[in-house]
From Swiss-Prot:
Assembly and interaction partners: Heterodimer composed of CysD, the smaller subunit, and CysN.
Species this chain originates from: Cellvibrio japonicus (strain Ueda107) (Pseudomonas fluorescens subsp. cellulosa)
Enzyme class, broadest EC rank: transferase
Listed GO MF terms: ATP binding; GTP binding; GTPase activity; guanosine tetraphosphate binding; sulfate adenylyltransferase (ATP) activity
SUPFAM superfamilies: EF-Tu/eEF-1alpha/eIF2-gamma C-terminal domain, P-loop containing nucleoside triphosphate hydrolases, Translation proteins
The protein's annotated pathway: Sulfur metabolism; hydrogen sulfide biosynthesis; sulfite from sulfate: step 1/3
Chemical reaction(s) catalysed: sulfate + ATP + H(+) = adenosine 5'-phosphosulfate + diphosphate
Gene responsible for this protein: cysN
Region of interest: G5: 202-204
Cross-referenced InterPro entries: CysN_GTP-bd, CysN_II, CysN_NoDQ_III, EFTu-like_2, G_TR_CS, GTP-eEF1A_C, P-loop_NTPase, Small_GTP-bd
Region of interest: G3: 110-113
Region (G4) residue spans: 165-168
Protein's name in the database: Sulfate adenylyltransferase subunit 1
Amino acid sequence: MSHQSELIAQDINAYLAQHEKKELLRFLTCGSVDDGKSTLIGRLLHDSKMIYEDQLEAVRADSSKHGTTGEKIDLALLVDGLQAEREQGITIDVAYRYFSTSKRKFIIADTPGHEQYTRNMATGASTCDLAIILIDARHGVMTQTRRHSYIASLLGIKHIVVAINKMDLLDFNESVFENIKADYLAFAAKLGMKDVMFVPISALDGDNVVNRSEKSAWYKGQTLMEILETVPIAGDKNYTDFRFPVQYVNRPNLDFRGFCGNVASGVVKVGDEVRVLPSGKTSHVKSIVTYDANLDEAFTGQAVTLTLTDEVDISRGDMLVLARDQVPQSNHVRAHLVWMTEKFMQPGSEYLFKFASKLVSGQIESIGYRVDVNTQEHSQVTHLQLNDIALVDVLLTQSVVADKYQQNRATGAFIVVDRLTNITVGAGMVVEQLQAEQTTPVNYSEFELELNALVRKHFPHWGAADLRKLLK
């Protein structure tokens, strides 16, 4: 099936060992309706030989029923899995796909191109390292292009690849390519985008996707796959500011007490002095435990269990940082907020806010402005509705560690949860911490407390927070 099918057949252990060491790149594709996002992903999977024969046969059969490419096989059907999407020829949900080459592993997020699915795109973009912005060569930079680029920039994606698609319909005209490139760069400069690359492609025929095209001799740059395999992403991670949100306290016996979680950013070593937030107590790292073996140090992204030299009171939601670092905490932050539910958001409404592993109650205090995702213009509004993006001030009942999102995506992001239904209603990216304010405790009605108890009793899989504990 793949480039390593022979190695898999001969020595599966060697293949797995080699595969484990590969770097992982997460990227998303976004563009206007019919720009060819799903076709491009299908082409990447097909030309990198990551499609099973039975999958290919199924797509050939479906092409005659749902296909949009005439006699040619419709590779978009490899990705458009939902029946509603196939019948409409569009992408609604975020479709994730996995593939690998000899150099890297990839996770693709195929995101919706329509404005009414802005929340879906924001979800797909939140964990990505790179974005492929598709532009139809016949139409150039459009309103949707600006919207997707703005969202990618807002979500902290540092690498942008502009794939100018359907160049085959214009005979790979170099002047068309250069004009679109100039238009996009003028817009990208306003968003502060620095690493922007351009590739002329035909997703339908495969030109410059995986294999270099003979139709564009004037193009001397890399193919799309070469860019994906070589773009440097290791430097994008924050290895400076150690942040360790405690997810679980592990006590298998009386002699062991470890704190489990993912290293959100930075590096920690055995012997390092750490501070527990919010209590401020300090201790030293005694050991770094993993399933395979103990480590001398742990890096960003690793799931580990830390043990400390002292008996310190630590629970889920606490944050471990290096004692020498000055890490500010506040209960008042300014953030960009993506609203994700049909129920309007009115300033002053009470919600639960989840920062890393810490759940705290609070309110969206005020709306600074709403951003028009198509024009990036600001407007004053009294409430937010589905798919709105706005600058807001958030006031919490407790102080949290909230880094700037552009500096630390792991601890600069939060979600907003409806306190009764436990539904995620918004996602936020911290712009700055504001001066802490005194807050009055949230007063839940007896009905709200009883309803919350019933939800937790009969629907434990929803993971609803215990409101009574939040009042303590």
